[in-house]
Amino acid sequence: MGSYKGVYDREILSKIATNDGHGENLEYFDGWKAYDRDPYHSTKNSNGVIQMGLAENQLCFDLVTEWLLKNPQASICTNEGVNKFMDIAIFQDYHGLPEFRSAVAKFMGKARDEKVIFNPDRIVMSGGASASETLLFCLANPGDAFLIPSPYYPAFNRDLRWRTGVNLIPFTCSSSNNFKITKEALQSAYEDALKKNIKVKGIIVTNPSNPLGTVLDKDTLKMLLTFVNAKNIHLVCDEIYATTVFNSPSFISVAEVIKDMPHVNQDLVHILYSLSKDMGMPGFRVGIIYSYNDRVVSTARRMSSFGLVSSQTQFMIAALLSDDDFVRRFLVESRDRLFRRHQHFTSELAKIGIGCLQGNAALFVWMDLRHLLDEATVERELKLWRVIINEVKINVSPGSSFLCSEPGWFRVCFANMDNATLDVALNRIRSFVTRGRVDNSTMTTTSARAAATTTTTTTTTTTTTTTTTTIKKKRGQMELRLSFNNRRFEDGLMSPHSILLSPHSPMPQSPLVKART
């Protein structure tokens, strides 16, 4: 019946409705499902799954709450603000409230240490992640492609590919140079795409990086700008984590670099931004497109009418971000709290022999568990991941979901919980590692424990030096005990074998940006 139903659905429904491009049926969602079934609570479910797969910033809610209590007029749901109800409830210009766009532009400048001035008239608002999708609708047609350095945020496959029909082509970044983008890898990916008759429309980067928690330096940004200018393709910089940089080197926006490169065609440069990470407000669904291209701004603004930020949200955010004293205090305090949380988490991991890529930004660490794999394969990584979910009872994200070329890396979020919960998670990790060292209680021997020597490279980065230490460890051949059945990758969101597939590829081109303004 299931097979027949699938055929019937494909006959009467669209390709989007019948493909699995959203990706929620992929095995990488199993960790989220485990958490949803059995969420940790300090008193009601202390043995539940701790959510460390969610990049959410909960460290400064008290500052926002305090501001709201002092400024009740910023909400129409209070006695002080209710007189604004009618003005906010009626239809608004889909360009956005002028005070909202001005406040966001000003905040974006402060988030970049006021080295850049942003023009409110170039800001297009959109509901959350639809901003990135809207931008790609403006820049590319179904079947076109964007190059993207891997590892990269896996939901880009959903946010950028699913409905637009645009392909993402990853090019590999390696731990040998701390996952830095190289011109050689970029050029190779570009040439390979051309050989396959794929039209490359641009490059997408996240700065600071998700999942690495690192920032792009000025030389790399200059290289990217020079590259896209020479090829006449676009550069999209997702700067959603701009104010989460808590240690040196400082964040450098592409908007700052382009000022010193007058020969670069600014029509090719676009910035994505949001308040979800910097302000910890993903539920408010505030997504921002900032483009230097007039046609993109006008087209994206028309398209944004399908997914506007609510007027009530705009009203409150405008008041919040217009308070210079609050913004100044918030940015300083947020960076300090992120620094202390990151420092505590990574130092405790180091005590039990777990290293992380030396990051200085974002809400997570890129944790190195390669030494726990007896074989450097995706299959072994996923088996370890399932043990972490089902036995350690922590949901983390495996590197293969980010298209990382080196099995054994995991993204672990540390800012979406209180200190006590973080310490519970650390105790669980500590116990797991200690048990494994003492009696291998989380593993089952598959052969007589013949000694095997494996060379593991652990890379540690500082702001000025990179030290590579080769550590030899003897391990028996072991098989991780599983609670879930192993499944094959399915077509869709995060399979490394389906990156170039698109439900829209047969569709005719839809040149939205060519429409008369």
UniProtKB/Swiss-Prot annotation:
Cofactors required: pyridoxal 5'-phosphate
InterPro entries recorded: Aminotransferase_I/II_large (IPR004839), Ethylene_sulfur-biosynth (IPR050478), NHTrfase_class1_PyrdxlP-BS (IPR004838), PyrdxlP-dep_Trfase (IPR015424), PyrdxlP-dep_Trfase_major (IPR015421), PyrdxlP-dep_Trfase_small (IPR015422)
GO molecular-function terms, A-Z: 1-aminocyclopropane-1-carboxylate synthase activity; pyridoxal phosphate binding; transaminase activity
Entries under Pfam families matching the protein: Aminotran_1_2
PROSITE patterns: AA_TRANSFER_CLASS_1
Catalytic reactions of this protein: S-adenosyl-L-methionine = 1-aminocyclopropane-1-carboxylate + S-methyl-5'-thioadenosine + H(+)
Superkingdom to which the source organism belongs: Eukaryota
Keyword line: Ethylene biosynthesis, Fruit ripening, Lyase, Pyridoxal phosphate, S-adenosyl-L-methionine
GO biological process terms on file: ethylene biosynthetic process; fruit ripening
EC numbers on record: 4.4.1.14
Residue segments, region Disordered: 443-467, 497-517
Subunit structure: Homodimer.
Protein name per the record: 1-aminocyclopropane-1-carboxylate synthase
Naturally occurring in which organism (per UniProt): Dianthus caryophyllus
